[in-house]
Amino acid sequence: MASSPLLFVLLLLLPLEVPAATRWSLLEALPEGAAPCQVGELCLQASPQKPDVPLVNVSLYYEALCPGCREFLIRELFPTWLMVLEILNVTLVPYGNAQERNVSGKWEFTCQHGERECLLNKVEACLLDQLEQKIAFLTIVCLEEMDDMEQNLKPCLQIYAPKVSADSIMECATGNRGMQLLHINAQLTDALRPPHKYVPWVVVNGEHMKDAEHLLHLVCRLYQGQKPDVCQLTAELSKEVHFK
């Protein structure tokens, strides 16, 4: 997958030569107060401007090697997350169109893009399980941007989670823990109502989002509290397009 200018900017802001204690990054600007998540998921939740105003919930059901999933994650969800984190609650569920079966007490998986995708789904599930929420999200975005995700697991971890080894993540992915995490994601995916028909399958506030190309505009429209400044800009641009 071709690298995006946005990710290159992020990487430039996180040079490996800079000590972790003094490293300037977008992570330092992210609000604290992320809520605990269920295992196998990622819930990135910053403190809302008003505690009585619910955040907008966005859930992404996807698979690691799906081109459309990668495009949505990198070009739509990630930029939206960066711009309106304070009003957004995100859940990631890597599984997609895979199938599972129980063989002698162990779960075996068949993935749409082959065994490599099953492994990468487990890798991302393990990242979500073992890393702090924001760090896991950024690491997954880093991986999904790369053509060879296995080879880039270590570099992406060195950028965002230098104390975590790629070997520990791969041990999780290839062991019982990875199998358990993917089974949990299978259950979450199978529980969708209506059932998912394709991936990426995006659910916003409990409703399937058919038009996944205007996520920022939708999040801004649905949030009932004081909106970030970028929402006003989005509304003005929408009006300009409408009148043209």
From Swiss-Prot:
Keywords in alphabetical order: Disulfide bond, Glycoprotein, Immunity, Lysosome, Oxidoreductase, Redox-active center, Secreted, Signal
Main location: secreted
BP terms from Gene Ontology: antigen processing and presentation of exogenous peptide antigen via MHC class I
Signal sequence, renumbered to the chain: 1-20
PTM annotation, UniProt: N-glycosylated. Sugar chains contain mannose-6-phosphate.
EC annotation from Swiss-Prot or TrEMBL: 1.8.-.-
Record keyword Nucleotidyltransferase present: no
Glycan attachment points: 57, 89, 102
Disulfide cross-links: 66-69
Cellular localisation: Secreted; Lysosome
Other notes: Both precursor form and mature form have thiol reductase activity.
Subunit structure: Dimer; disulfide-linked.
Name of this chain's protein: Gamma-interferon-inducible lysosomal thiol reductase
Source organism of this protein record: Bos taurus (Bovine)
